[in-house]
A protein has these predicted regions:
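NAD(P)+-binding Rossmann beta1-loop-alpha1 motif at the extreme N-terminus of oxidoreductases
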Residues: 2-76
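NAD(P)-dependent Rossmann-like dehydrogenase/reductase catalytic/cofactor-binding core
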Residues: 2, 6-16, 234-319
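Rossmann-fold dinucleotide-binding core
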Residues: 120-211
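Rossmann-fold NAD(P) dinucleotide-binding segment
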Residues: 82-131
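Active-site segments that bind and position negatively charged phosphate/pyrophosphate groups
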Residues: 199, 203-260
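Small-residue helix-packing motif on alpha-helices
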Residues: 65, 85, 101, 236-240
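A short helix->loop->beta-strand "cap" motif at the edges of active sites that frequently abuts
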Residues: 52, 113-117, 136-138
Length: 319
């Protein structure tokens, strides 16, 4: 039975689904994984080892095709070009890059879909922002592992798994939730647990985290801290050590393992006092207002629209 997750006030905010909540399997179904980069390789190997009839859909003789052959996938048996893989599959897992998906979908996947098939995504971007509009007679689901493909594979091989978010955008067959939960089980994700969400919430929260915290905010914060010390005359090596190395090598692992309070309880009293005295001075209300502005751009579709247009015009050249 699903385990309820409650906040500090006792309100149920989520339900954790684990192995005992899986009520069906994918026996008799064929799974086509489209793409063989980080997530594609990690996920497909796990599905195959879990006994699911798994095939790959790739560009023939590309680098991913060659890697797949090295990993034991066999041409015309378990390795096909994308259109043929889609024709053979009951479930199609889209794990090529977000930027490449719309063109590949339109040219090679959509013409080969038939009623009752399932499209599975690992990120909600193209569905939520309507870069891909599936027909009404297919299921549209998502399994978003909270870790890169290499870690997904390593955790699976260790007998555990990486947690994942699950969502169903379109349930034509009436079995979309059962099937995506069974797929999560085959990935090992139900061992730590999976959570139900929506395509909207997954992509908007994911983009927000990347931009204001994980990839954008942290990088700029560290950069400003480093520059402040160097501009004040401190040795750049010392500045790097204090502002970058200790964040990733000491503080982040402590916060990951023990939480923010546990991290503060693990550092010196002087460090704790400094954090409490200056943390909000640096990350003040103005910073929060900037974060809200970033979130608004994500929610309105402004960021997605600008990114899609930029990619169509320049590719990765502007990055």
């Amino acid at each position: 039975m699903a385990k309820q997750i409650r906040d500090a006030n006792g309100k149920v905010v989520a339900e954790l689904l684990q192995e005992e909540d899986v009520t069906s399997n994918l026996d008799g179904k064929t799974l086509a994984v489209i793409g063989y980069a980080s997530q594609g390789r990690g996920q497909s190997l796990c599905y195959r080892d879990s006994g699911i009839n798994t095939i790959l859909g790739l560009r023939k003789n590309g680098e991913s095709w060659k890697q797949a052959l090295e990993d034991g996938w066999e041409e015309n048996e378990t390795l096909f070009e994308i259109p043929e893989a889609v024709k053979k599959a009951d479930m199609i897992v889209m794990v090529i890059a977000d930027t490449a998906q719309p063109e590949v979908y339109k040219a090679q996947i959509e013409p080969n879909l038939s009623a009752g098939k399932t499209l599975v995504f690992s990120h909600g971007f193209n569905i939520h922002f309507r870069q891909i509009i599936p027909p009404k007679n297919v299921d549209v689901s998502m399994i978003a592992p909270k870790g890169p493909g290499r870690i997904v594979r390593e955790q699976y091989e260790s007998g555990f798994g990486v947690p994942a978010l699950l969502a169903v955008q379109q349930d034509y067959t009436g079995k979309a939730w059962d099937n995506i939960l069974a797929l999560a089980d085959a990935l090992g994700a139900t061992r730590p647990g999976v959570f139900k969400t929506t395509f909207k919430d997954e992509v908007e929260s994911d983009l927000f985290g990347e931009q204001v915290d994980l990839c954008g905010g942290v990088v700029e914060m560290v950069k400003h801290a480093f520059e402040t010390l160097v501009e004040a005359g401190y040795n750049p090596l010392l500045a790097y050590w204090e502002c970058h190395h200790e964040l990733h090598g000491l503080i982040a692992p402590l916060a990951y393992k023990y939480g923010n309070v546990g991290m503060l309880n693990s550092v010196s009293l002087t460090a704790r006092k400094g954090a409490l005295a200056s943390g909000k001075r640096v990350m003040d209300q103005h910073v929060k207002e900037n974060m809200k502005a970033c979130l608004k751009d994500i929610q309105s579709g402004k960021f997605a629209k600008e990114w899609v247009e930029e990619y169509k015009q320049y590719g990765f050249k502007k990055m």
